[in-house]
Each structure stands twice: as C-alpha cells, then as structure tokens.
Curated annotation (Swiss-Prot):
Cellular compartment(s): Cell junction, Adherens junction
Record organism: Drosophila melanogaster
Protein name: LIM domain-containing protein jub
InterPro entries tied to this protein: Ajuba-like (IPR047172), Ajuba-like_LIM1 (IPR047245), Ajuba-like_LIM2 (IPR047247), Ajuba-like_LIM3 (IPR047248), Znf_LIM (IPR001781)
One GO MF term: transcription corepressor activity
GO BP term, pick one: protein localization to centrosome
Primary location: other
Record function comment: Regulates organ size by inhibiting apoptosis and promoting cell proliferation by influencing the expression of G1/S-specific cyclin-E (CycE) and apoptosis 1 inhibitor (th). Negatively regulates the Hippo signaling pathway.
GO cellular component, one term: adherens junction
Compositionally biased region (Low complexity): 290-303
Record keywords: Cell junction, LIM domain, Metal-binding, Repeat, Zinc
SUPFAM superfamilies for the chain: Glucocorticoid receptor-like (DNA-binding domain) (SSF57716)
C-alpha cells in the first residue's frame, strides 16, 4: 500500500507536496517506540526521491556514539586549553640579578623569555607538578616561580604534601586592598575557618542572583561599585638561591591582604571608604607587577603598574570597621599626622606565629618621611597638577634584613589631580597611600622582639645595619665589680693572717724533738724536724750537698756519708761511686735500703721463707746471714714447749719472749702447772714442782700419789727448781 503511493507520488510530481505531508503525519517519529521509524528523508532531487523514501534510517550504534562522544570531549579539551592559555602565565625564569630579591619579593622584575632546551620544553621544578607525578629538572643558578593560580584548589589525604601558599585561597580586592583568604578545606588544624566565610567576611555585597566571582581571580569594586575581575597571577619562589635558606612567605594562621597602590585618586569615595584602618596594617615588602612602560594609563583599572602590599591579618577577618571601631584603634595606635607618617602596629598573634616558624621575622614600625606627603597634599589642595615620582622597588641583597635598601633611579610621570572632587585631607591621604613606601620611607626601622642596640629609630637612622644578625644586649649581664675587696675577702685575709701567726708561734714554742745531727742545736716543732738514716735533722739542715735543695719528703742518696738529691745523683756522675746490692750485686741507682751495715735494693730485701718484702718491717738474721721475718724465724728457731710441743714465741703485742726452764726442758708459762690440780707452779716453797714419773705435780698431789702406791720401797722425791728466762 505504501509502495504504491510512493510510486504514484513519483509519477505525479505535482501532488508530491501533499502526499509527502500525509506520509510524514502517518509516520511515528520518536525514540520511545520499540520498532518505530526514525524519520523520512526529504532531501533529494526529483529523480532519487523514491529511493530516499524507501531507505529507512536506523538508530546510531555503539561505534557512532563513541565517535560522537570522543569528538565532543576533544572539543571541550581544546576549549579548556585555550581558556587556560588565555589567562594563565606559565612558569617564568628571571635573570640572575633578581635571584636575591626573588626570595623577598614575589615578582621584582619583568619576566624574561623561558629558555628551552633541545627538546623544546623548559626544565623547571614545581612542587605541584611533583604531586601529579611529574619531575622537571630546574635550570642551574636561576630561581623558578610557579603560578599557583594555575592549579586551582585541590585537597588530598596527605595534608603535608599540599603547598601552603596563596594559590589555593580566594582573593578579592576591596577598596584598593587585595585580600587573600585562608584555605577553607582545613589546611591548618589549629586555625579552623568557618564554611560561610565568603565575600560577606570581606565586607562586599553581591546582587541577588548574580554570578559569584570566579575562583582564583580577584574580584574588585570599580568606580561604579560593580564587581570587576582582575587576572592577578600569584607566583611563588619554588627554588631557593644557593646558600640561602628557604623561608615561608606568610604565617599559616593569618590571612594575607595585598594593598593595591593607585597612581592617582580621582574619586572621593575611594578615600572616604578606606576599608581598613592604616594603623592596623603590618609592615611588609612591596610587590610590583609591571606590564609595560609604554602602556601607561591614568585610569585606576588599567594602571600599567599595580603595586600590592603584603599585609598579614588574622584568619577571622571582620567586616569593614565602623567609625567607633576606628576610633578605638586610634586610641591604642598613635598616628603622627593625617598626611604625614603612618604608624604600623604589630599584631601579637602575628608575632607569635612568626616566632613559632623556622626563621626570625623582624617586625617593625615604619616611620615615613612627612616631606613628600605634605608636598603632595599642598599640590592637591591648590589644584595644580602634582608631579609624582614613581620609584622602582629596591633590589635588596639576600643578607639585608635591618638596613637601607638601595633603590633604582626614579622615573617621573605627570598625573593630574583634582582638588575640587575631594577635600584636602582625603586627597593627601590618598596621595600618600599611592606613593611607594620606598620613596617616603628611605629608612625602614626593624625592631626585634628581643632587646638590641638598634631597637630605636635614631640608632637605625645613624647606623644602618646589613645582615640578619643578633646584636649584643644593651645592658651588661655581669655587674661590674666594686672597687676594693669585699667583706668576705677581708674576713678570709684576716683568718689567714691569724693562722700564719699561730703557726709561727707554735714553731717557736713547739714540741722538743732532740738535737740536730748536723748543727747540734735543738729541734722544736714538727715543721722543723726531719728524720733520715736514723738521725734527726732540721729541715733546713738536711739538704743536698751539691745543689742545696731541701730533701724533706724527697728521694735522696747517701754516697760515702754525703747526701745527694735524685737529679744530682743521676746526672752528675755520682752513680759511678754508687753501692752495690748485697743480694743481687747490681748498682743501686734509685732508692737504697741499708741494714746490718750493708746496702740493698728495697725489692731485694725479702724473707727467705715467705718472700715478703721487709722494707720497714722487723726482721731477723741467722748465723748464715739469711733474712727472716719474725714469725718465720720463731717458727723455725724458737724453743719448743715440753708440755704442748709448740714453739715459744713472743707474746702478742710485745717483742719479749718468756719461757720456763725446768729439768732441762722449756715450758710456756701457762704450760708449767700441776697436771692433777692445775695449780701454777713457781719457785715459791709451797708451789714448787714435785715431778713423779715424768709428770709435773705439786707437793700435795705428789704425796697422795705416793700413798696410793703402798710400796715399802717408795721414798719421797725432792722438789725441782724452775727458772724463768726472758728472751728479747
């Protein structure tokens, strides 16, 4: 049926339009049907119209879907690359002259062309690229700055691997201040940031339903109050200079606020709504981002040179302070003049965070010179065009921390000012704010939390210091000693004098020891007596016969009656006449021991039985001139007791030996007793010994023994005599 109609339609071209519409109405067009036709082909000439109507279109398969999706992904990827290349400034290399200032300032000089290697890729090293698994070798002796804004915000389970930099923070420019908010993802555990800390904390308002400012880009309020976008890339020095220690750029617990320095101030609203009090701003280096010197413009948005001041604030940044809060701040923070100096107070939390880091931050009050500010204020009040000097940021060496910064030659530019648009005081304030700090403050006085000699502005102005060094304390740690001896010293001297007098008196009236062997006078006092070789000497009389040195308490040598000290005896040839040891026969070159008219080495004079050294110990010599100690001599040669059989030795504690000799026998005194009754036998008449059959008996026991025997031939024995002999 359908085929016939299509053939008829081919034959009658005039009715083709109506038939075609009827056919299209009958066809089921849609993707919900299970076996519906996708659509009819209506494009074609009159000749191939039938063929087009006969061919039905089928649904796309998996291959077609894959090709279409891949094409769409490629297009999206290309669009993203174009967008990134449009607003991203990739890694930049700076000349070697800016290496030192790179650690202090973010972008001190206009960037140069990246030097490519033979493969066409710049060899640099980025910490963020290292997280992604990439390793790029850095160029030698050149600092590399990484555009932290390129990667956006990211989070990881490894908190320590995340770069703690402003690249993952949201920024907004409010009334000339570029505010860098801390990380919302909880980068710092000790500084929790609430989730609702958005643009409301910055004091900015956004229209209902309006698009929020893009992440990673600064939102600024224009002259009309609308939000405007500024592509302000943030760079971080990721390679420290050789010999310089890498330092953190900001405290982790504080938010970073950059102050935009405008060349001119044409509107009174920008000066009246100052945003934050200048007294609450912290001293920090100036950062300059220069586009070109030829594209200068007087407008605030298209300024060729934008200056940002790094101002550290607490993470809980409050809204814009009111007049009452500003008045309270001014009560605690002194301000010299409206258009003159700006006194920057230091936040205690900021100092605590800086002190807890790994470097010493020298926070200070910046005392600005009021001459330039007053001159600009007068020119603005009179309505004459003021000529403002724009000075390039100084290049500070790596060792500069507390001194003057050598600035480049200034360049002048004429900027029209309007005195009718704003009062004199706000205009002077704005002019001072737009003036670089390097021009108005040639001397930056940096004070350390610890006391130092250069802690005042006068000392810093007179003696500018170069180098981060710790100065000596202005006060003396050790108090000066008073003139003359102290009371304790006087007491010690008095006691010493009394002791010396007592010693002299005791020597004069001391103990008498005897007559000196040399001079024949009396020896009194222990300090004057000296005993040697069995004789008594005065201390001053017993001296070396060669050098006259006193020999008390020292080694000496007696050579033929003459005494020598050890030095004279050893090195003056007197050892040739030295005596020989009576035991070993060798010369006695050191200490000598004399006994029984002979000389011995102290080590050679020993007991022949027990081999004990007898130096200073009593000894005995037998008939063969053998040397014995006392105990060994008595054990060998002492008489034996006839009763107990033991040797009769001297009584303990004495050198005397007592024995009893009776009946040609030797007895101990304690062994000479009656064997029957135990009575001590002596030479007394009633205590004499009456021996019987070889036994010691007294007279009574002797008679009893005879009575018991009842022998007619037994006769009475006469008593025997006993003698007591003492041996010394």
């Amino acid at each position: 049926m359908t085929t016939q109609r299509t053939q008829t339609q081919a034959r009658n071209p005039g009715n083709s339009d109506s038939d075609y519409e009827t056919l299209m109405q009958r066809l089921h067009i849609g993707g919900g049907g299970g076996a519906g036709v996708g659509g009819g082909g209506g494009s074609g000439g009159p000749g191939d119209g039938g063929v087009a109507m006969r061919s039905y279109q089928r649904s796309p398969g998996a291959i077609e879907n894959y090709l279409q999706e891949s094409q769409q992904q490629q297009q999206q990827h290309q669009m993203q690359q174009m967008q990134q290349l449009h607003h991203n400034q990739d890694y930049k290399l700076y000349e070697r002259g800016n290496i030192i200032a790179a650690s202090k300032y973010a972008t001190p000089r206009p960037v140069e062309q990246i030097q490519h290697t033979h493969n066409g890729s710049a060899q640099i090293y980025a910490p963020t690229a290292q997280i992604l698994g990439q390793r790029i070798a850095p160029q030698k002796h050149s600092p590399v700055y990484e555009n932290l804004e390129f990667y956006g915000q990211f989070d990881s389970n490894h908190k320590r691997a995340q770069p703690q930099s402003p690249g993952s923070r949201q920024s907004a420019i409010l009334n000339g201040y570029l505010l860098m908010q801390p990380i919302r993802a909880g980068r710092f555990a000790h500084t929790p940031v609430p989730e609702n800390q958005g643009s409301a904390s910055l004091g900015t308002t956004r229209a209902a339903g309006g698009p929020p400012p893009p992440s990673g880009r600064s939102a600024a309020l224009g002259p009309t109050g609308d939000l405007e976008e500024h592509a302000a890339p943030i760079y971080e020095n990721i390679i420290p200079h050789s010999g310089q220690r890498a330092q953190p750029q900001a405290s982790p617990a504080t938010a970073t606020m950059y102050q935009e320095m405008q060349p001119t101030s044409n509107s009174s609203g920008s000066s009246s709504t100052a945003g934050l009090d200048l007294n609450a701003l912290l001293a920090s280096p100036m950062h300059q981002r220069s586009i070109s010197s030829n594209t200068a413009s007087s407008s605030s948005l298209g300024s060729p040179t934008q200056r940002y001041r790094n101002l550290s604030l607490p993470s809980h940044l409050s809204p814009v302070p009111t007049a009452q809060s500003v008045a309270k701040l001014q009560q605690h923070t002194p301000v010299k003049s409206p258009g003159g100096a700006i006194n920057v107070s230091v936040n205690p939390n900021y100092i605590e965070d800086i002190n807890s880091s790994d470097y010493v931050c020298m926070t200070a009050n910046l005392h600005r010179n009021t001459a330039a500010g007053l001159a600009t204020g007068r020119a603005a009040a009179t309505g004459a065009p003021a000529q403002r000097t724009v000075q390039e940021p100084p290049i500070i060496t790596s060792s500069l921390a507390m001194g003057m910064a050598t600035a480049a030659p200034p360049t002048t530019s004429n900027a029209p000012t309007s005195a009718a648009a704003a009062p004199a005081a706000p205009t002077s304030t704005a002019s001072l704010r737009a003036t670089p700090i390097a021009m108005t403050a040639p001397l930056a006085v940096a004070t350390s939390p610890t006391p130092s000699q250069g802690s005042t502005a006068v000392n810093a102005a007179l003696k500018p210091r170069r180098g981060l060094t710790k100065n000596l304390l202005p006060y003396s740690v050790t108090p000066p000693r008073p003139a003359g001896p102290t009371e304790a010293q006087r007491k010690i001297e008095e006691l010493t004098r009394q002791l010396e007098e007592e010693i002299e008196q005791s020597e004069e009236h001391g103990e008498y020891f005897g007559i000196c062997h040399t001079c024949g006078e009396k020896v009194k006092g222990a300090g004057q007596a000296c005993q040697a070789m069995g004789n008594l000497y005065h201390t001053n009389c017993f001296i070396c016969c060669s050098c006259g040195r006193a020999l008390r308490g020292k080694a000496f040598y007696n050579v033929h009656g003459r005494v020598y000290c050890e030095e004279d005896y050893m090195y003056s040839g007197f050892q040739q006449t030295a005596e020989k040891c009576a035991i070993c026969g060798h010369l006695i070159m050191e200490m000598i021991l004399q006994a029984m008219g002979k000389s011995y080495h102290p080590g050679c004079f020993r007991c022949c039985v027990c081999n004990e050294c007898l130096d200073g110990v009593p000894f005995t010599v037998d008939v063969d001139h053998k040397i014995y100690c006392v105990n060994d001599y008595h054990r060998m040669f002492a008489p034996k007791c006839a009763s107990c059989g033991k040797g009769i030795t001297p009584v303990e504690g004495t050198d005397e030996t007592v024995r009893v000799v009776s009946m040609d026998k030797d007895f101990h005194v304690d062994c000479y007793i009656c064997e029957e009754c135990g009575m001590q036998l002596t030479d007394e008449p009633d205590k004499r010994c009456y021996p019987l059959d070889g036994r010691l008996l007294c007279r009574g026991c002797h008679l009893q023994r005879l009575a018991l025997q009842s022998s007619p031939h037994a006769r009475h024995q006469e008593p025997v005599c006993a003698s007591y002999q003492y041996m010394g």
